[in-house]
Amino acid sequence: MLSKGLKRKREEEEEKEPLAVDSWWLDPGHTAVAQAPPAVASSSLFDLSVLKLHHSLQQSEPDLRHLVLVVNTLRRIQASMAPAAALPPVPSPPAAPSVADNLLASSDAALSASMASLLEDLSHIEGLSQAPQPLADEGPPGRSIGGAAPSLGALDLLGPATGCLLDDGLEGLFEDIDTSMYDNELWAPASEGLKPGPEDGPGKEEAPELDEAELDYLMDVLVGTQALERPPGPGR
């Protein structure tokens, strides 16, 4: 009887010890629970509860009190973590721009302005240099620079091969000469009486042209007058 009583007392003490071990982290006055932060305490408590729940379910004869205790603990943790998750995150205030950022922004603005001015100058220069210009080839000292044709003489200019002035040679040159000005200067004294009056307007009348008979007559008159005006010689 005595041995049985001792054995029963020992079994009661063994049952109390696991309960004390399992319930110490539920006491908020415990030093380990009080020193731990709320988030760390909740996470550690949740991990321990889940671990004990799985351990109890793996046993062949699970303890009902232990399961109820673990489930209540999990519900309490879930209720305490729900308001914290429901609260929206507090937006952090925007950081004030530092002096280095202001300097970088000003330097970037100055650099962009200088680049824009350089691009405008380059586009202006490209617009001016769009017309192709012949390159100056370097040749002997006697040769003109830039591919210019050498100086031609008068005969070379008149020649048909050059094509500078004429294409038909000297005959075309004489055909193109207008001799009317020379005729007017030659017969100007004789034809003064035939000139029209002063020009009154833009529609002036041209001087009548003289035919060959009139020219011969004028020549005879001029020759006769010159003979009459010539003084006789001393022997006559």
From Swiss-Prot:
GO terms for cellular component: cytoplasm; nucleus; sarcoplasm. Residues 197-207 have a biased composition (Basic and acidic residues). PROSITE patterns: SERTA. Polyubiquitinated, which promotes proteasomal degradation. It comes from the Eukaryota. Residues 1-20, 189-211 are annotated as: Disordered. It holds the Pfam family SERTA. GO terms for molecular function: transcription coactivator activity. GO terms for biological process: positive regulation of cell population proliferation; positive regulation of transcription by RNA polymerase II; regulation of cyclin-dependent protein serine/threonine kinase activity. Keywords: Transcription, Transcription regulation, Ubl conjugation. Residues 38-85 form the SERTA domain. Interacts with the PHD-bromodomain of TIF1, TRIM28/TIF1B and p300/CBP. Interacts with E2F1 and TFDP1; modulates transactivation activity of TFDP1/E2F complexes. Also interacts with CDK4. Acts at E2F-responsive promoters as coregulator to integrate signals provided by PHD- and/or bromodomain-containing transcription factors. Stimulates E2F1/TFDP1 transcriptional activity. Renders the activity of cyclin D1/CDK4 resistant to the inhibitory effects of CDKN2A/p16INK4A. This is SERTA domain-containing protein 1. The lineage of its organism: Eukaryota, Metazoa, Chordata, Craniata, Vertebrata. The gene is SERTAD1.
